[in-house]
Every structure is written in structure tokens, then in C-alpha cells.
Regions:
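N-terminal secretory signal peptides that target proteins for export/translocation
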Residues: 1-3
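A residue-level marker of the well-folded mature domains of exported/periplasmic proteins
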Residues: 5-7, 15, 23-221
């Protein structure tokens, strides 16, 4: 999803809450990001900071470093800082439920970004349609390589809605076009891991024709 559009959507949902803009002016919102080692999430952070500033908010950004325990500690910390809204990009769609439960108990409105949460009360979820995106990628490969192409898949972080949905969407296309799935392994949305996993898979599947990576960082690796 375009980060400018995402920032606008985030602000729109915040503004539709029960607290008015004027009442919240100069108050602090919080953004908890799964990792800032991924350029996508840096762009997300930058867009959120720009929109928060334009609306007169302070934005506190915390990095969970792809660690659910760090994510939980971040949210626990935020509940005593007096922030008004929590924007969270989950490290794991199941594990984040513990962090959201703490925010819910503190009556802190929660919005999830890019990755959904399987538990807890969330005001809104803002993301692209990852199932549709995965299917589009598979259909595109079919236009270039035809039916029954030999494919390898680089998966994202297990447990995230983005990895699950992109994989599910790609499978729809793979089944429709009778792809031969030679291998599919996780590389955790990481460039270096993408390189290492791809090298290992290529050593056993030299006849591969195409690769589907569930994010751009793995593809660049």
C-alpha cells in the first residue's frame, strides 16, 4: 500500500474516534513497528510522523526488533506514558494478542497496520489486500512462463498475516496454472536470509524457472 495513503487512512480513523482533534492537539500517539531494519516499515514510520506533525500530534515510535517479547514490553511501557492512540504493526498475528490485551485493559485505542491481529479488540486494521497481491504475482508469473512452470517460493515470517495471506493468494494462482512447486521455505522477510535460503534451494533445484518472494527485501537478496 502507498505510504501516503496509509498515513491518510490512519489519521482518518483516529479522527473518527470519540476524542476530537482539538481536544487531542499536542497529545501523543504511539507507533510500535515490528522492525525498522526493513525499508518498508521505515517508510511507514516516516509517513505516520509527517501526518501526525501536520495534525499537531507528537508521535512516539518504538521498534520491536521482530521480537514478540520486545513488542509486549513496548506496549506495557506505552500504557504508563499516557499516549492516546496505539498504532501497531505486529511481529506475529497471534503473539500480538497479549500486547493488545494490555492496551485494551488500559482503554487505549488500537489500530493494526499491514499485519492483522488474531486476538484482542482493534479499532481498525489498515493494510493492502495480501491475498489479492499474492494471486496477482502468481498470475503474472504464468503470463511470462506459462502453465506448469517450475517455481520456488520465499516465505515471510511464519505467524504473520501478511505471509499467510500472500502465500494463500499465490497458491490460488499456482493451483490454477498447475505450477510445479519445487520448494517453499521461510526467509523471514529479510534480505540476507533471502540470499542464503535461495542459494540452498537452488543447489537442489537447478531446473527452477521462477521465484515468488513474499516481499521485496527477500527478492533483492
Amino acid at each position: 500500500m502507498n505510504m501516503k495513503k496509509l498515513a491518510i487512512l490512519v489519521s482518518a480513523v483516529v479522527l473518527s474516534s470519540s476524542v476530537s482533534v482539538s481536544a487531542m492537539a499536542k497529545d501523543t500517539m504511539a507507533l510500535v513497528v515490528s522492525t525498522l531494519n526493513n525499508p518498508f516499515f521505515v517508510t511507514l514510520k516516516d509517513g505516520a510522523e509527517a501526518k501526525a506533525k501536520a495534525l499537531g500530534y507528537d508521535l512516539l515510535v518504538l521498534d520491536s526488533q521482530n521480537d514478540p517479547a520486545k513488542e509486549l514490553a513496548n506496549v506495557e511501557d506505552l500504557t504508563v506514558r499516557g499516549v492516546k492512540v496505539l498504532l501497531i504493526n505486529p511481529t506475529d498475528s497471534d503473539a500480538v494478542g497479549n500486547a493488545i490485551a494490555i492496551a485494551n485493559k488500559a482503554k487505549l485505542p488500537v489500530l493494526t497496520l499491514d499485519r492483522g491481529a488474531n486476538k484482542g479488540t482493534v479499532v481498525s486494521h489498515i493494510a493492502s489486500d495480501n491475498i489479492a497481491g499474492g494471486k496477482m504475482a502468481g498470475d503474472f508469473i504464468a503470463t511470462k512462463l506459462g502453465e506448469k512452470a517450475k517455481i520456488i517460493q520465499l516465505e515471510g515470517i511464519a505467524g504473520t498475516s501478511a505471509a499467510r495471506d500472500r502465500g494463500a493468494g499465490f497458491k490460488l494462482a499456482a493451483d490454477a496454472h498447475s505450477f510445479q512447486m519445487l520448494a517453499s521455505q521461510p526467509a523471514d522477510f529479510d534480505r540476507t536470509k533471502g540470499l542464503n535460503v535461495m542459494e540452498n534451494m537452488l543447489s537442489g533445484h537447478g531446473d527452477v524457472q521462477g521465484v515468488f518472494a513474499q516481499n521485496d527485501e527477500m527478492a533483492l537478496g
